[in-house]
């Protein structure tokens, strides 16, 4: 973990208040299980877990997110002096939370079970250094029965700037819950001057069983304040409100990379545009609502298939979902257009990694955006590749589409927090 912290915190200062730093990447749980030949077994266990939680999820008013699908992360710090954390970036939620010192009874962190089959170099990226050894099996592992044991945890007694908040929270995810209380302290992107004072954040005292399998500590929500539990102001909006940004933008660039963990999975720019990875020509799309980064998707096509409903669909940019979520009929038709085959046992679509297939074309705000096969044909170890789409059952509050990283790998996303719009810029 120390190596990861040192590398992920490398910073390039673009101007006084425009900063750019690396986004880390790790293949999502489905990709990792598929690479091990255990995707069917994983899906069976996961579906059984979800069925047990169905009543709880149906009655929950909190955003329902699949933590196991997340793949991109950044490093932040809280408190004075700084306590560092590695967090998933999630534009589909708006709260910041990390494990509290009382989670797992305040015990010292041990090596999580996810380190067991991790190659040495990747282990150094995502696990504590003492968990990693150069052996044939990979790394040594200390058993853990608590999801918090392998996490960095926030200790308020060590921070001179910490203030209590008094409010509690309970966030429901597809594969578990996160419960705890809110606190207030200084937030920074680690080893930078990009800091916001008085940031309200969640201190988790209990996290669901699925979280133990993930090396990251928590989540930083990039959505709008209206989406936040208890209406807390998200960190990026706090930075804007406190005048810490040159422009009210943050930009997400995601690189096209293979099925292995990477320090350089992309770039996260705050306070201005990303002129290194993204075209200077930005197409601005008005938002439908200021909750998700949600907008109207006019249509989609690929080869001979084309679909454009009269009223379009509501779609949201989503850094958390590794694939693209869409209505079942659309996913089935797109899969047919590119030659992908559904495998019921795994709940996923597969296709030839070297297949020459047409682009998938989206119509947004009257303009067309081509997504090449390099973005939606995803390698997941030996064997065929995965088609990076999944069926999304949406209703009511939720958009019909979640345009995840496959689309973001083709177009940088510029989030304008002041004017309520989303910019799309072609990746250079």
Curated annotation (Swiss-Prot):
GO terms for biological process: apoptotic process; proteolysis. Glycans are attached at residues 155, 191. It comes from the Eukaryota. GO terms for cellular component: extracellular region; lysosome. GO terms for molecular function: aspartic-type endopeptidase activity. It is found in: Secreted. Synthesized in the intestine. When secreted in low heme conditions, localizes to neurons near the anterior and posterior regions of the body and in coelomocytes. Residues 72-425 form the Peptidase A1 domain. Its main location: secreted. The active site is at residues 90, 318. Disulfide bonds join 353-385. Induction: By heme deficiency. Disruption phenotype: RNAi-mediated knockdown in larvae results in defective heme accumulation in the intestine under low heme conditions. Double RNAi-mediated knockdown with hrg-4 or mrp-5 in larvae results in defective heme sensing. Residues 1-16 form the signal peptide. PROSITE patterns: PEPTIDASE_A1. Gene3D superfamilies: Acid Proteases. Keywords: Aspartyl protease, Disulfide bond, Glycoprotein, Hydrolase, Protease, Secreted, Signal, Zymogen. Its EC number is 3.4.23.-. Proteolytically cleaved. Belongs to the peptidase A1 family. Aspartic protease which plays a role in heme homeostasis and mediates inter-organ signaling between the intestine and extra-intestinal tissues when cellular heme levels are low. This is Aspartic protease 10. The gene is hrg-7.
